A protein has these predicted regions:
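Short alpha-helical segment that forms part of, or immediately flanks, the ligand-binding pocket
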Residues: 203, 226-231, 245-246
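Conserved donor-binding/catalytic core segment of Leloir-type glycosyltransferases
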Residues: 117-124, 128-172
């Protein structure tokens, strides 16, 4: 099958870029299965296993799609007048105005909140991450995500760690001084800011972490921070919003909207790094994801829509409770 994957940004992603990372691994897995993959992606993109067409925003996107494409997998709004079989994966909490019925979301909760039952969990190629060292001593906790986004609730994560005697927090994805969202300065010797980190540094820190503190105050569509942390043996302590109840089972973490309850649980609970690792490795890998997307492609190529109706926003609540 000739499959074209359309992205708005450059591939590969080096430090951050969840959509690019997931779609890169999808393309890689499809290539391994014998499919011909073409990426349409941002300026400067390159790929060793697929043809790359540089996205030209000044030209009608329909004219940039290869004529031999059997199906087009969009990750940006579908252009008007599209005639090729296609689908759109929605990665955020919104829907384009021109949406049709061939839409895929990234978790069950994500789909249901946007009027759909069609979803595929994000998967990663764990071989790229290398083997997880599950025997290291675990000392600090970590936060992984764009700390500047208020809904990621870095303040909540810091408060939880501060309430645990001698606990320290490694912040991956944030800075002690942040001027982008107004003046924010965090001074606490127990909180360590690492900025945007690459995969190797991320691995070193999480393999020595007692757990991911993830008290988001919005409906997280998926959360690669969760599956990456679990893969490296770190349990997840988060809020019961969005996809988290689907991703975090009791054997690999704990969910609550109350900071004190989270802190108390963290101090008394014990989790197996091996169980966390195997859980993420087996359930959220790129092979499982590719298999699910191939079923979606087959449905569309058989002339059937992925949704009975055009998805629409049902619940997009922001700033959910946290105390």
């Amino acid at each position: 099958m000739n499959i074209t994957i359309v992205l708005g940004d450059k591939i590969p992603s080096i430090k951050y870029g969840g959509t690019q990372r997931v779609m890169w691994y999808l393309g890689k897995e499809l290539h391994k299965r014998g499919h011909k993959v073409t990426f349409i992606a941002g300026k400067g993109s390159s790929c060793p296993f697929a043809k790359v067409i540089e996205l030209d925003p000044s030209v009608n996107l329909n004219t940039q799609i290869p004529t031999d494409a059997d199906i087009v997998h969009f990750n940006i709004p579908v252009p008007e007048g599209i005639t090729k079989p296609h689908l759109l994966t929605i990665h955020g909490n919104g829907i384009p105005a021109n949406a049709d019925r061939n839409i895929v979301f990234v978790s069950r909760n994500h789909a249901q909140r946007l009027g759909s039952e069609s979803f595929v969990y994000n998967g990663l190629d764990w071989d790229d991450y290398g083997p997880a060292n599950l025997t290291l001593s675990r000392k600090n906790y970590h936060f992984l995500g764009k700390a500047a986004w208020k809904v990621k609730n870095i303040k909540g994560a810091i408060t939880v760690v501060q309430s645990i005697k001698n606990a320290q927090l490694d912040v991956l994805g944030g800075y002690r001084l942040n001027l982008k969202m107004g003046f924010r300065f965090t001074w606490n010797p127990r909180i360590h800011f690492h900025g945007m980190v690459d995969d190797s540094k991320k691995k070193v820190i999480i393999e020595q972490s007692k757990g991911l503190i993830f008290p988001v105050t919005w409906h997280e569509p998926f959360g690669l921070a969760i599956t990456e942390s679990l893969y490296f043996g770190a349990p997840v302590f988060g809020t019961p919003y969005g996809a988290l109840p689907e991703l975090v089972s009791p054997e690999v973490g704990f969910l609550t909207a109350h900071g004190q309850e989270m802190a108390e649980h963290i101090q008394s609970a014990q989790y197996s790094p091996k169980v966390c690792h195997e859980y993420a490795r087996d359930l959220f890998n790129s092979s499982v994801m590719a298999e699910a997307y191939l079923k979606k492609y087959e449905t569309i190529l058989n002339g059937e829509p992925l949704n009975k109706e055009v998805p629409h926003i049902i619940d997009i609540a922001r700033r959910l409770p946290w105390d």
